[in-house]
């Protein structure tokens, strides 16, 4: 019975200059890894589709088309897929195919309004999909693209200054040099101990990624610690200042995404954590904005 359902053709989808592009490795599903060529947001997507017949047989088909699709998928709800862009090109009208054929396609400056993203519970994908329509089962081939969106240097970039305090026990001031960082940037700051009347065991700074899906009241958030950096071990002295320097390059970071197509957001936070000798934790979080600079693609 399997013979009757095997595809009578091989379909090869090739993107122009694919071999010369930089690829992104990603985990498409748990345990299933893949890679995709990087495209810029305003770049034309073009290539070829090669259809080869098997065993010298002919192919009766109801048309051949290629689609460029941008979609958002909630991974905890497999059926919840939202398309935010779609372009279609007809490659062949219904008819008969007796030999191998190659078709060219071009989606000129096709709309790519968001950056590609695969998170814990949401995926934003761009797909080229070829469909050979038949009276029996359609033959479909897909290829993912990975889209980067580059930004200019922010016009404003404010100093972050906050404090952590417990009445008559602890007072700490800390500051970071700015609140917006490109993905290869360095976080520079300092922590100043004004009052210390508890036994401090250690102090850490963490980068937290918070992924939020949906809108209130049907909203779901997931937080993960990207990295944890211990900046102090042992009890500090009053008046002591501890410098902070964290290099972002090398961590799996994305730009900040805010309300993408009203479906999800991805935000980043710097979390200062202080642990005393009784393992009590005192912490303060501050949101930072991450953005992609053009030279990060080079």
Swiss-Prot record:
Q: Extract the InterPro entries matched here.
A: Arrestin-like_C (IPR014752), Vps26-related (IPR028934)
Its signal peptide is: none
Offer one example of a GO biological process linked to this entry. Answer: retrograde transport, endosome to Golgi
Q: Identify the GO cellular component terms for this protein.
A: cytosol; endosome; nucleus; retromer complex
Q: Which domain of life is it from?
A: Eukaryota
Alphabetized UniProt keyword annotations: Protein transport, Transport
The record's similarity note reads: Belongs to the VPS26 family.
Record note on quaternary structure: Component of the retromer complex which consists of vps29, vps6, vps35, vps5 and vps17. Component of a retromer subcomplex consisting of vps29, vps26 and vps35.
Q: Which PANTHER family match?
A: VACUOLAR PROTEIN SORTING 26 RELATED
As for what it does, the entry says: Plays a role in vesicular protein sorting. Required for the endosome-to-Golgi retrieval of the vacuolar protein sorting receptor pep1/vps10. Component of the membrane-associated retromer complex which is essential in endosome-to-Golgi retrograde transport. The vps29-vps26-vps35 subcomplex may be involved in cargo selection.
Q: What is this protein called?
A: Vacuolar protein sorting-associated protein 26
